[in-house]
Amino acid sequence: SAYFTEDELKELNSSYLKEGQLSQASGLYIFPIQKSSEALYLNWTAWEPFAAACGVTTDDLATWEGVADVAAKYYAWSNGRHFFGRDAYANYLLVGSTELGEAMFQTNGGKADFHLNREILRRMWDNFVVPYAKGYYNAAGRYRSDDMKTGDLIAYVGATSSASFTPTQVTDPDGNMTDIEVRVLEVPSFAGVEQRCAVQQGAGMVVVKSDETRERAAATFLRYLTEPEANIAIALKSGYMPVRTSAA
């Protein structure tokens, strides 16, 4: 970068910087500001009586196969209530295909190739679409945190940046509100994979080519946004993760 030294760039998370390099030969085109991943949010208040009655533990939620199995048990135990939902279906496909050995999108020489592996797609189908069709999973509101607020789900996968929207109460159809405890778990992976994966997403900024004065001013602003004090303040208010390693 013409406006950032190597030492300055080394202070930023290297994987965030790599994401902003659109090809191996390119410079830094997208400057990282804030990043997020995904987590599993669990209504612990609703989980405890179910877990005690059915002999399940949070270890069973470590894999997608386990989530589907637990959801089936919850459906039977609760007389037909939904257990789980997730935001961002695309993340399930992209991360899942990568975990299972053949990423859906692969880059080669600066170009992206689209790959569909039938066996991998079938495994992802069996662990999401099938339990969804059976009523074990559901999506009713705009976001799954909305569905937890209404008691329609007791678990969901959503962005870590959405943690501030995680409900602390459940409201029933009659308007009665019940306080709940929510616990956050690692996002599930597929059973038996060699390496667990999680999505990396978030905000970055680009500087439009103009003249040196404007470009340098924009770089100064980006430098300010990623200083530890400012970056931590933004992270706390937004729920995103800071990009500077000293602020993480």
Spell out what each predicted region is.
Residues 1-39, 179-187:
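Hinge/lid segment of periplasmic solute-binding proteins
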Residues 26, 126, 134, 173-245:
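Extracytoplasmic/periplasmic substrate-recognition and gating elements
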Residues 68-75, 109-141, 187:
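Glycine-centered hinge/linker elements that transmit conformational signals in sensory
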Residues 154-159, 166:
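Paired acidic/hydrophobic, glycine-rich loop segments that form the ligand-binding mouth/hinge
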Residues 18-40, 48, 65-113, 120:
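Extracytoplasmic/periplasmic solute-binding protein
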Residues 46-57, 211-218:
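Short helix-loop capping/hinge motifs at secondary-structure junctions, enriched
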Residues 2-12, 56-60, 102-123, 171-176, ...:
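Short, solvent-exposed loop/beta-turn-alpha elements that line the ligand-binding surface or hinge
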Residues 68-73, 131, 142-156, 171:
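Short helices/loops that flank or line small-molecule/ion binding pockets
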